[in-house]
UniProtKB/Swiss-Prot annotation:
Entry GO terms, CC: cytosol
Descriptive protein name: Peptidase T
CDD domains reported in the protein's UniProt record: M20_peptT
PANTHER family in the record: PEPTIDASE T
Listed GO biological process terms: peptide catabolic process; proteolysis
Source species: Parabacteroides distasonis (strain ATCC 8503 / DSM 20701 / CIP 104284 / JCM 5825 / NCTC 11152)
A Pfam family matched in the record: Peptidase_M20
SUPFAM superfamilies: Bacterial exopeptidase dimerisation domain, Zn-dependent exopeptidases
Similarity comment text for this entry: Belongs to the peptidase M20B family.
Residues involved in Zn(2+) 2 binding: 139, 174, 377
UniProt cofactor note: Binds 2 Zn(2+) ions per subunit.
Alphabetical keyword list: Aminopeptidase, Cytoplasm, Hydrolase, Metal-binding, Metalloprotease, Protease, Zinc
């Protein structure tokens, strides 16, 4: 089975995560997918295969040489984003010759070159697209496919000498819980790589520092006809609070290393209103300043309206750079591997996070490598077939180079 065959099979599993369930995995489809992967790993001859109660899959490709070689891990996640349906995904492969791609003629859903100019980079290539009704799931079933296919390749090519290789598939990465129950000691690696990046060539060892915030506003409701000097409208307090945050620090106005406040949700009535934010910044100092600004503004609101606002603030993950940079050789190894298979590395900060960010702080330095997809989390997601194949080749080459250098 080719890496493409595996990917097309994997996207048929509905594994959309859900942060509201409070379970691990957060949705039953992830367990179904995990169990199917266990059977595939058994079929290709992997060893030490485990599936725990939280649906973490781990397996081993034993060393085929007596040389002392570091144990490397490769990790991808089972779930797809809760932002868009992952049910009944119907991928199709088109040879892209330029222009727009009609995904759903009936609903006029078009993958437009003017809106997504990166399409032009793949002219002449086969690309996998959606039917315009769901996401594709390249994030991160592209990574899962690349890892499983690379293990199959190494089993079929014993002439490629390698050390012990560990692989893992995790649930609920998309809702920030992918590392919650990851057993780093059991995984037993010197370092790892998540195969969870985007376009071909992406190599990332910097990510956002991240926090989540919820501000709850209390009001007082009375009959609006008799509300003068009595009513306190919680929804209006929430709107006022949102206006105090710097508009230039919203996601739509930031890029590169610029952080942001992102209003992800709001609910409201006169009696109670809630604003949900995520706070992001690559720089730890600026990250802390953003959190402090929220605290200051909540205090300001409560000074004007005593007891009106309550802040719930929780750190989610931190920038892995401070852990990975002292072991830069693991980034250099991936860089060399990409170059060796004809891929130009694109080293840039992740404007997001991966399981590897938290795992790095849990004792497993873990940069991120491309899986090949673009426009994640929506109906315009697509995956060039060559990019998927090169992701697999990069995994194999990392393993091969690690053995040679040892």
């Amino acid at each position: 089975m080719t890496v493409l065959d595996r990917f097309l099979k994997y996207v048929t599993f509905d594994t959309q995560s859900n942060e509201e369930t409070g379970t691990t995995p957060s949705t039953p489809g992830q367990r179904v997918f995990a169990e199917a992967l266990v059977k595939e790993l058994e079929a290709i001859g992997m060893e030490e295969i485990s599936l725990d109660e939280n649906s973490y899959v781990m397996a081993t490709l034993p060393a085929n040489t007596d040389e002392k070689i570091p144990t490397i891990g490769f990790i991808a996640h089972l779930d797809t984003s809760p932002d868009m349906s992952g049910k009944n995904v119907q991928p199709r492969i088109v040879t892209y010759l330029g222009g727009d791609i009609v995904l759903d003629a009936e609903e006029n859903v078009v993958l437009s070159q003017s809106m997504f100019p990166e399409l032009s980079d793949y002219k002449g290539q086969d690309i996998i697209v959606t039917n315009g009704k769901t996401l594709l799931g390249a994030d991160d079933k592209g990574g899962v496919a690349a890892i499983v296919a690379s293990m199959q390749y190494l089993k079929d090519h014993p002439e490629i000498k390698h050390g012990k290789i560990r692989i893992a598939f995790t649930p609920d990465e998309e809702i920030g819980q992918g590392a919650d129950h990851f057993d780093v000691e059991k995984f037993g690696c010197d370092w790892g790589y998540t195969i969870d990046g985007g376009q071909i060539g992406e190599l990332e060892y910097e990510n956002f520092n991240a926090a989540g915030a919820k501000i709850i506003f209390k009001g007082l409701n009375v009959h609006p006809g008799y509300a003068k000097d009595k009513m306190q409208n919680a929804s209006l307090r929430a709107i006022e609070f949102a206006s105090w945050l710097p508009a230039e620090q919203r996601p739509e106005h930031t890029t590169g290393y610029e952080g942001f406040f992102h209003l992800t949700g709001m609910t409201g009535s006169v009696e109670e209103a809630t604003l949900s934010y995520i706070i992001r910044d690559h720089d730890r100092k600026l990250f802390e300043e953003k959190k402090e600004l929220l605290r200051t503004l909540v205090d300001k609101m409560n000074e004007a309206h005593p007891g009106c606002a309550h802040l719930e603030l929780r750190d989610q993950y931190y920038n892995m750079r401070e852990v990975v940079e002292p072991q830069k050789h693991i980034v250099d190894l991936a860089f060399e591997a990409m170059t060796s298979v004809g891929v130009e590395p694109i080293v840039k900060p992740i404007r997001g996070g991966t399981d590897g960010a938290r795992l790095s702080f849990m004792g497993l330095p873990c940069p991120n490598i491309f899986a090949g997809g673009l426009n994640f989390h929506g109906r315009y997601e697509f995956l060039p077939v060559r990019s998927l194949e090169k992701s697999m080749e990069t995994v194999i080459k990392i393993i091969e180079l690690s053995a040679r250098k040892s």
